[in-house]
Amino acid sequence: MISMNPIMIRNNLSRSSSPAAPPITNHTSTVDYFSLKPKLSLDTSSQNDSISTQSSNNDDTHSDQQDHTLYTHNHYFDDDYDDDEDEDFDIRDQLLDPFDKITISNCNEEYYSPLTPFDDQTTSPQDSIISSKSSNKSTTVVPPPQFQLTLPKLTTYSFLIVDDNIINLKILNRILLKLFPKCHIVQIQDSKLVKDILHKQPFDSIFIDIEMPDVNGIDIAQFVRQDSKFDDMGMVAVTTRNSTQDLELFKQCGIDCTFHKPLNYSLDFMANSIDDIIITRKNKI
């Protein structure tokens, strides 16, 4: 029998009591660290679950930040050129945005630059765009505005004005002087004096008011047309009475034309009407 000292017996007991160590095997795994780490954390005790979970999250965040920093550092110089291009496109868009808002359909609006004078003849960008497009097809010539210039007639007429209202006399006198600057005008406010004046001097035309005291316009018209000596004299009624019955009565009394008060007629119309009346009366003789 082999004798063993106490030290050897102790070593043998310690070796036999300890579990056999598993064999060491080297396996090449394709699993990365981030997928393996959650599995390793499951082997820990239940008391340290919360601590290990928090620490693993912190490690993951830290590692993600490192990876993001590495990725940003590695791709910084690669994206530099792209960033420059993006900035160029942004600046170009900012410059072209105001012109994109200009629409041809809104042609009434005008846009002014700081150096553009505020004049009625200023051409807006819309007009320039339309003109540039239409110039290739056809050219439209805008005629200059036409101004109607009334020239006074230089005929030396002689007129008689009869009206009981002094204001109406002055208004008609001023109008006749505008139409015929060289005419001679006699104004009578008292209608009873008309017969004497007509016998004393001839007139080319007489302008009478209808509603007057003592001798009205109808009385004067009948007196004039009863005497053949005044057949070549024109007669115009200037009155507020303009109904159909009144106009028919004036025509029967020998009145050639009627101007309604107030005299809102063009100067050309009044001048041509007076000329036609006088010429027609003189041609009948």
Curated annotation (Swiss-Prot):
Disordered: annotated segments: 43-66, 114-142
Pfam families named among the record's database cross-references: Response_reg
GO BP term, pick one: filamentous growth of a population of unicellular organisms in response to biotic stimulus
Keyword vocabulary terms for this entry: Phosphoprotein
Domain of life: Eukaryota
Transmembrane stretches, start-end: none
Residue numbers bearing the 4-aspartylphosphate modification: 209
SUPFAM superfamilies: CheY-like (SSF52172)
Function: Required for stress adaptation, morphogenesis and virulence.
PANTHER family to which the protein is assigned, alphabetical: RESPONSE REGULATORY DOMAIN-CONTAINING PROTEIN, STRESS RESPONSE REGULATOR PROTEIN 1
Name by which UniProt lists this protein: Stress response regulator protein 1
